[in-house]
């Protein structure tokens, strides 16, 4: 009987936590940003620069069953402690005007990667994209991590 009571108390506590910004990491629960919104950085990575961590990934905020929107660009967050994440907006926005673009919301952008190239002094982003059942790649560059990113090569087959 005591075990059941403990589980019920834990369930009540977790329901309360879900309605607020978490004060600790809760495995298996939705991770929220500093505004209490669900973090949209699917298939993401973390980049560290100038005392800031950046968490970036696929933005699925507009994705819903049957609406044809697979992603809505790449969203990023900043943090000084790897726990409190501030939404910084879209790092790489979708190209909603051009249906043929690999960045169109109907394309499946997967696992963006960003590195800093010391030789060119550019930030380089590459992503695999599935478009019309074909795997392609896209490369973008920027002068600073926060963008703007410009496409330098797209539509080629990844290794």
Predicted segments, located by residue:
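Carbohydrate-active catalytic/glycan-binding domains of CAZyme proteins
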Residues: 1-159
């Amino acid at each position: 009987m005591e075990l059941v009571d403990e589980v019920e108390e834990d369930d009540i506590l977790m329901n309360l936590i879900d309605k607020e910004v978490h004060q600790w990491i809760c495995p298996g629960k939705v991770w929220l940003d500093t505004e209490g919104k669900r973090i949209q950085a699917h298939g993401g990575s973390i980049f560290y620069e100038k005392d800031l961590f950046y968490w970036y990934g696929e933005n699925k905020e507009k994705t819903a069953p049957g609406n044809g929107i697979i992603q809505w660009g790449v969203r990023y967050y900043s943090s000084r402690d790897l726990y409190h994440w501030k939404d910084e907006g879209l790092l790489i926005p979708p190209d909603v005007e051009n249906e043929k673009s690999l960045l169109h919301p109907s394309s499946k952008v997967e696992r963006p990667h960003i590195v800093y190239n010391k030789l060119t002094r550019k930030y380089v982003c590459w992503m695999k994209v599935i478009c019309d059942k074909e795997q392609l790649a896209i490369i973008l560059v920027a002068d600073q991590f926060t963008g703007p990113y410009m496409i330098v090569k797209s539509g080629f087959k990844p290794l």
